[in-house]
């Protein structure tokens, strides 16, 4: 009987862990990206902001709203082009007292990998405040966040994709070719 009670307790505990591991999305709040100093997209989901490329005023605004960590998915080539990004983002973020995490994604040199997702999860876990995740127009950021919801927050892939589409995930090219929505299954 004693082992049976331990077994029941363990099963109950594991079921609670599964329930609490799922991300509760209170809402996806779309903000005025241009007015706040961001390119194309700015949304808030709980303690995470997802956006396109921030201007300095955008970073200032998010710092005032409690953002302490900025995760940038743009490549070095993108970030070093002063015609595209007219300031040194990493240095500016440092001057604001915020943490800068660079996970470049895009092209053969910076492929989408499980390691990139692991780095993002670590950045989220280590953040002591709100987090900004950004790329150029929030497309890569939407994809990374969607994968994060599946791998680390227990959402099924179709639910995560629907949430990602509310930001800037877009449609799968296959859906455009076939002119219909595709449903994916986890294996």
Pin down the residues of each PLM region.
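Bacterial N-terminal signal peptides that target proteins for export
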Residues: 1-8
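Bacterial N-terminal signal peptides
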Residues: 8-18
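Cys-dependent protein tyrosine phosphatase-like superfamily
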Residues: 22-131, 146-187
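A phosphate-binding catalytic loop at a beta-strand-loop-alpha-helix junction
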Residues: 132-142
């Amino acid at each position: 009987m004693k082992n049976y009670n331990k077994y029941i307790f363990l099963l109950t505990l594991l079921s609670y862990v599964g329930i609490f591991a799922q991300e509760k999305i209170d809402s996806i709040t779309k903000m005025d990206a241009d007015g706040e100093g961001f390119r194309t997209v700015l949304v808030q989901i709980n303690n995470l902001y997802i956006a396109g490329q921030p201007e300095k005023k955008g970073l200032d605004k998010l710092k005032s709203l409690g953002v302490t960590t900025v995760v940038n998915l743009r490549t070095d080539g993108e970030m070093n082009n002063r015609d595209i990004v007219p300031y040194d983002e990493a240095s500016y973020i440092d001057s604001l007292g915020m943490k800068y995490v660079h996970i470049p994604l895009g092209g053969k040199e910076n492929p989408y990998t499980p390691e990139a997702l692991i780095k993002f999860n670590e950045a989220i876990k280590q953040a002591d405040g709100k987090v900004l995740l950004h790329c150029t127009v929030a497309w890569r950021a939407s994809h990374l966040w969607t994968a994060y919801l599946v791998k680390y927050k227990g959402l099924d892939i179709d639910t995560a994709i629907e949430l990602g589409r509310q930001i800037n995930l877009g449609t799968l090219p296959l859906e455009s070719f076939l002119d219909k929505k595709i449903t994916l299954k986890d294996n």
